[in-house]
């Protein structure tokens, strides 16, 4: 085998690796993101330990009419389950459902949402049972925003988002409207669901993270929620 052939082969391997890395980074940055459900704020639709794929391209900007016609992009609609940067701590990602759109007037009375004076049909909503069960995210306010909020008008280029588990969700009722620029993408599908038994979100040390990986290795088949695999998110 000639020296030039060896160099050519090594170069081809190197170029293939570089291209693969660039492609993976492009997909991760602009197209798809993996996301794990850390809390119960979206129950019963999304459970702690659900691993999702998030379509980041669907809300991406498009410059031309032809691109809008050909590429799978879209506008943000009421009912979309979205992943976004938490406005009060942008390094963290949250997941909620879009309820109020720009320009709409939203009001919450007795836990029922109205948009522009019309009751909203929300079959996906879940409430804590029995009544009076404590909520991790409940805050002390002049009135309980879980029961009553507004009316408020959603500003331009902002959205009002809420968790499906209305009594246990830190959402727009507590921290306000969500700017359009903070939205990263639409939740697409559950590719894996694992019940680690840890409950709601908590900070992990390096040791706990390694212990968690070991637990997944041991309990993968028994704790994986097989019936939730490839479940489309609505």
Spell out what each predicted region is:
Residues 2-11, 26, 30-36, 41-234:
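Soluble "head" domains of membrane/secretory-pathway proteins
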């Amino acid at each position: 085998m000639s020296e030039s052939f060896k160099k050519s082969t090594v170069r081809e391997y190197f170029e293939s690796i570089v291209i693969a890395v660039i492609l993976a980074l492009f997909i991760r940055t602009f197209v798809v993101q993996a996301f794990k459900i850390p809390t119960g704020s979206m129950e019963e639709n999304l459970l702690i330990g659900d691993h999702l794929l998030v379509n980041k391209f669907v809300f991406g900007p498009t410059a031309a009419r032809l691109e809008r016609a050909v590429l799978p992009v879209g506008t943000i609609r009421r009912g979309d389950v979205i992943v976004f940067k938490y406005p009060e701590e942008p390094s963290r990602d949250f997941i909620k459902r879009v309820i109020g759109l720009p320009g709409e007037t939203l009001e919450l009375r007795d836990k029922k949402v109205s948009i522009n004076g019309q009751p909203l049909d929300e079959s996906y909503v879940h409430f804590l049972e029995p009544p009076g069960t404590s909520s991790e995210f409940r805050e002390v306010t002049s009135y309980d925003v879980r029961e009553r909020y507004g009316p408020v008008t959603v500003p331009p280029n902002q959205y009002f988002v809420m968790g499906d588990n209305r009594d246990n969700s830190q959402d727009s009722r507590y921290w306000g409207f969500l700017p359009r620029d903070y939205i990263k993408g639409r939740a697409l599908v559950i590719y894996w669901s694992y019940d680690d038994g840890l409950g709601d979100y908590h900070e992990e040390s390096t040791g706990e993270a390694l212990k968690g990986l070991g637990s997944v290795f041991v309990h993968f088949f028994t704790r994986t929620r097989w019936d939730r695999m490839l479940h489309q998110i609505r």
